[in-house]
Amino acid sequence: DDIPDKYQITFTYVSADDDKGTVTGTTSEIATVYEIFRDSETGEITELGPQTPQHPTQPSTVTPKDGYRFEKWQQDDLTFFNSDDELRNSEYLEDQTFIAHFTVRRDLHYEIHYFYEDANGVVTEDTAAAIVSDIGVFGEKILTTTVPKESEFNGKHYVLERIEGADKQIGLDPKENMVNVYYSMDEIGEIDPDEPDNIPDKY
């Protein structure tokens, strides 16, 4: 650009972790920190004006990977910027590297539902026990606690029959972030007809 490098600074943009997000496109830019005066005929530099701090323009493309979001820019001296606009308002006289940090998403929807089947095969959901959340963390298991093998519902004793989605992890599709827990009535037993035996009565 016909300007000596010693009168310019470089802004560089990188990702802290390419597995979480990338910084691509224009990842560096040059800024001139001196006003330069030249001879009108020879073009030689005749005088330098005072140094003027320069603003980064952040021309790069920042792309989070699935399950992550952009969190902040970090400047060399551990100054942080929460957005491109904040970064662009900063100014420097020396080379700088800006590091894009990404964090896992914690705003994902998931649901856990509990169903109870009586002796007649009628299935009823315990809506009061349902868990509906919009603060799911990407990649974490939906079921984080052990499901009890026995449960009481409407004054009756039930035994755990099956769990649909027991090992599911929270993903990006809310329709897939569902776990259904099924209990079956257990009011009678093989040894004592009046005592539950952890075997569904329908069997």
Q: What do the predicted segments below correspond to?
A:
Residues D1-S15, N82-F115, K168-Y203:
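Conserved "repeat-terminator" motif of extracellular CCP/Sushi domains
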Residues D39-T42, Y68, L108-Y110, M178:
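Surface-exposed receptor/substrate recognition regions of extracellular proteins
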Residues T26-E41, L48-P56, L93-D95, S133-T144, ...:
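Solvent-exposed, conformationally flexible loop/turn segments
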Residues L108-E111, Y116-D118, K141-V147:
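Proline-threonine-serine-rich low-complexity tracts
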Residues P53-D85, E140-P174, N198, Y203:
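Surface-exposed interfaces of beta-sheet-rich extracellular modules
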Residues D17-T26:
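Small-residue (G/S/T/A) turn/hinge positions that recur once per unit in extracellular repeat modules
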Residues T24, T124-I135:
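Short, acidic Ser/Thr/Gly-rich low-complexity loop/linker segments typical of extracellular
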